[in-house]
Curated annotation (Swiss-Prot):
Alphabetical GO biological process terms: propanediol catabolic process
The protein's enzyme class: transferase
Source organism superkingdom: Bacteria
Name of the gene: pduL
InterPro entries given in the database record: PTAC
Keywords, sorted A to Z: Acyltransferase, Bacterial microcompartment, Metal-binding, Transferase, Zinc
Name by which UniProt lists this protein: Phosphate propanoyltransferase
Residue numbers binding phosphate: 84
Assigned protein family: Belongs to the PduL family.
Necessary cofactors: Zn(2+)
Length: 210
């Protein structure tokens, strides 16, 4: 095949792949616990799988906790596994107001200077001094996905979400690239409500780099 024809064909295929929908995951409030904090809150137990999540080796656990803040509480907040090196609580802005906590917008794992909250299980309770965040909206992807979409780890992109009755463009969507990741955009419940994205079939579409 002529080199120019080959390049044209490859370019067309890549363009079609760039226009494919991105699966959308709506993250409700949830908790990641360290092994030490899990052992304190659920003595003698092991974290147990309730449902596998889209990202490899990630799952919703059977165990839940109550979050207690200065102004209110949130019950039956799901624990996600596996256990981590540090406990982290991810809430929406609405959840944070219910608790009476000013939670900063952060990427997962960026916990320095974040507020804490009281965690209550049926067996014990624990006050963590930091770890509560509102998660920055982001897209997980593999290196191959990043190559196809022409983005790199740490980039910020704009993404369009078309709900049942609305279309909304989100700017400043962080790109997270890892060989262990599958293509999926994560937004919280406040963002999903704003976009009318309550249908599990709703997908996102990459618009451009922010």
């Amino acid at each position: 095949m002529d080199k120019q024809l080959l390049e044209t064909a490859v370019g067309k295929v890549l363009e079609e792949m760039r226009e494919r929908p991105i699966p959308l995951g709506i993250s409700n409030r949830h908790i990641h616990l360290s092994a030490q904090d899990f052992a304190h809150l659920f003595p003698g137990q092991s974290i147990s799988v309730k449902k596998a999540l889209m990202q490899p080796d990630q799952y919703a656990a059977e165990q839940t906790l109550t979050l207690v803040g200065p102004k209110g509480k949130l019950e039956k907040v799901r624990l996600l596994g596996p256990l981590r090196s540090a406990s982290q609580v991810e809430v929406s802005r609405t959840d944070a107001r219910t608790l009476g906590i000013t939670a900063p917008l952060r990427m997962s794992g960026d916990l320095q200077g974040t507020p804490g909250v009281r965690l209550v299980s049926p067996f014990a309770e624990l006050e963590i001094t930091s770890g509560v965040i509102v998660a920055q909206r982001h897209i997980h992807m593999s290196p191959l996905d990043a190559l196809i979409l022409n983005v790199s780890h740490g980039d910020k992109v704009s993404v369009a979400i078309k709900g049942d009755e609305r279309r909304l463009i989100f700017d400043n969507v962080a790109v997270r690239v890892s060989p262990d990741m599958r293509l999926e955009m994560h937004i919280d419940t406040d963002e999903a409500n704003a976009a009318g994205a309550d249908n599990p079939q709703v997908c996102a579409m990459l618009v451009n780099k922010s």
